[in-house]
C-alpha cells in the first residue's frame, strides 16, 4: 500500500484554482447526453467518478470529444432517452453520482441494462429510488441483495403520475428521479416522505435542469411538479463551477494557519457547500467573498461550534478535522447520511480522530470532538474514501506530521489534491 507522510506545515498562503464540481459535472454530462443539440462543457472534473459516467455514456451510444487534459468535453446529444437492441452492461465503480441518475434514466429507455460497481457500491442503498421508479412503471430487478446494486433494468419507459419518494437518507434518489421525470410519458407529481436531507444538492439539480430548458415547480421541497413529454435542449456551452466540497480543505487550512483563496466559485455559487465558509466564520476565521473567489484567513484562535450540518454533509467532514485546532468541544449534528457514503464516514472519522489523540463521541447521527493538548503522529486509514484522505491532511498544520494511507484514493474527485495542498504550504 502507498503511504504519504506530510511533515508539519508552518503556514499556508496562496491561491488554488479548484477542479470542476463532481456533482455538477456528472449531472451536466447526463443531461447533455439526453438533450437535443451539442453541448460544450468546460472546467469538467477529470476524476474516477466522471470517467465512469463518460464510459457509460459511450457504451450507451453517446458520442463526445474529450480534450487532452480531459477538462473540456463536447457532447452530441441524443435528443431522447437511450436505446439499445442488445443487452448492455455498465460498470460504475463507486460513483453514486453515476449509479443513481443512470438507474433512473435507463428506466425511460428501450433495452435491457445491467448496472454493477465495486464491492462498496453493493453496500450503498438504492431502494428508495427503485421504489419510486416502480411506482412510475419501471421494471427493475436486484441481482444480489434487495435494495442494493447490482441491478438489471428492463427499459420500457416511465408513465408519470403521483410518486412518493423517501427523502431521509440521500438527496441523490430525488435528484435521479427529477432528471428522468421530464422524459416520462405523463406529468409527474413527486411527494417527499420524511425530512429531505441535503436540500442544497436538489437546488443544484434544479438549476442545471433549468439550464437545459426544463423548469420544475415545488411546494417548499415537499411536493415537486414536472411536466412529462419534454425534451432537454442544449444550452450550447456549460461552465462547470469549481467544486465547493474540494474548496473546504483549503479554506479550513487558511482559517487554521494562514490565508488561502480558492477560485472557480464565489458568492453566487449554486453549490450549498459554500456555506462551509460561514461555519469557519462562526469559528473565528475572517472570510472574504468575491464573484469568483472565497478567501479564508486566520485572525486568532478558532473556537468550537455546535451546529446542525445536514445541509453541507460533505464539507462538514472538514469541520471534524478543523475541530482539532479549535478551543473547546465541537459538535456536528444531523449527519446520519455520512453512514451511506463512500464508507460509513461517522465511524471512520471517529476512529481516525481518536488515533491523533482527540476525544470523540460518535452518535447515531452526530459526532463530538474535543482536541488533545498535543496531536499525535498517526497513520490514517482512508477506507478508499477521498474525503477522509483530504480531511486528515490538515493535521500537518500542527507541529506533528501525519501519514495518509492510500493517498491515491483522492482520484475519485481530486487526483492532484496533495500537489495543490503542497503548493500553498510553507515549511
From Swiss-Prot:
| Active site, per annotation | 314
Give the EC number. 2.5.1.19
User: One Pfam annotation, family name?
Assistant: EPSP_synthase
- Gene3D superfamilies, per the entry: Enolpyruvate transferase domain
Cellular localisation? Cytoplasm
Q: Which HAMAP family match?
A: EPSP_synth (MF_00210)
Its function?
Catalyzes the transfer of the enolpyruvyl moiety of phosphoenolpyruvate (PEP) to the 5-hydroxyl of shikimate-3-phosphate (S3P) to produce enolpyruvyl shikimate-3-phosphate and inorganic phosphate.
Q: What is this protein called?
A: 3-phosphoshikimate 1-carboxyvinyltransferase
- Gene coding for it: aroA
Amino acid at each position: 500500500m502507498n503511504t504519504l507522510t506530510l511533515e508539519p506545515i508552518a503556514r499556508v498562503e496562496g491561491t488554488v484554482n479548484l477542479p470542476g464540481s463532481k456533482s455538477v459535472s456528472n449531472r451536466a454530462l447526463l443531461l447533455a447526453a439526453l438533450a437535443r443539440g451539442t453541448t460544450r462543457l468546460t472546467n469538467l472534473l477529470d476524476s474516477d467518478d466522471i470517467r465512469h459516467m463518460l464510459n457509460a455514456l459511450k457504451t450507451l451510444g453517446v458520442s463526445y470529444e474529450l480534450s487532452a487534459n480531459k477538462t473540456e468535453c463536447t457532447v452530441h446529444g441524443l435528443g431522447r432517452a437511450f436505446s439499445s437492441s442488445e443487452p448492455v452492461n455498465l460498470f460504475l465503480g463507486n460513483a453514486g453520482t453515476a449509479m443513481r441518475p443512470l438507474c433512473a434514466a435507463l428506466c425511460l429507455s428501450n433495452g435491457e441494462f445491467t448496472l454493477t460497481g465495486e464491492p462498496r457500491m453493493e453496500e450503498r442503498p438504492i431502494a428508495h429510488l427503485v421504489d419510486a421508479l416502480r411506482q412510475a412503471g419501471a421494471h427493475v430487478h436486484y441481482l444480489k441483495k434487495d435494495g442494493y446494486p447490482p441491478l438489471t433494468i428492463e427499459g420500457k419507459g416511465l408513465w408519470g403520475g403521483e410518486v412518493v419518494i423517501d427523502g431521509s437518507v440521500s438527496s441523490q434518489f430525488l435528484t435521479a428521479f427529477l432528471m428522468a421525470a421530464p422524459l416520462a410519458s405523463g406529468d409527474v407529481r413527486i411527494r417527499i416522505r420524511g425530512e429531505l436531507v441535503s436540500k442544497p444538492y436538489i437546488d443544484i439539480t434544479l438549476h442545471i435542469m433549468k439550464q437545459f430548458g426544463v423548469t420544475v415547480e415545488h411546494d417548499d421541497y415537499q411536493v415537486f411538479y414536472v411536466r412529462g413529454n419534454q425534451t432537454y435542449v442544449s444550452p450550447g456551452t456549460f461552465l462547470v463551477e469549481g467544486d465547493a466540497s474540494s474548496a473546504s480543505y483549503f479554506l479550513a487550512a487558511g482559517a487554521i494557519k494562514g490565508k488561502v483563496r480558492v477560485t472557480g466559485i464565489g458568492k453566487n455559487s449554486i453549490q450549498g457547500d459554500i456555506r462551509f465558509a460561514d461555519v469557519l466564520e462562526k469559528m473565528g476565521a475572517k472570510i472574504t467573498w468575491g464573484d469568483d473567489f472565497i478567501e479564508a484567513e486566520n485572525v486568532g484562535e478558532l473556537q468550537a461550534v455546535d451546529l446542525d450540518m445536514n445541509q453541507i454533509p460533505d464539507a462538514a467532514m472538514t469541520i471534524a478535522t478543523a475541530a482539532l485546532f479549535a478551543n473547546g468541544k465541537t459538535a456536528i449534528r444531523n449527519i446520519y447520511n455520512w453512514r451511506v457514503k463512500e464508507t460509513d464516514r461517522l465511524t471512520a472519522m471517529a476512529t481516525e480522530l481518536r488515533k491523533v489523540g482527540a476525544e470523540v463521541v460518535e452518535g447515531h447521527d452526530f459526532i463530538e470532538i474535543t482536541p488533545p493538548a498535543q496531536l499525535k503522529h498517526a497513520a490514517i486509514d482512508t477506507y478508499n474514501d477521498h474525503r477522509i484522505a483530504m480531511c486528515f491532511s490538515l493535521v500537518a498544520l500542527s507541529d506533528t506530521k501525519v501519514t495518509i494511507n492510500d493517498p491515491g484514493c483522492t482520484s475519485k474527485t481530486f487526483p492532484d489534491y496533495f500537489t495543490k495542498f503542497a503548493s500553498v504550504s510553507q515549511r
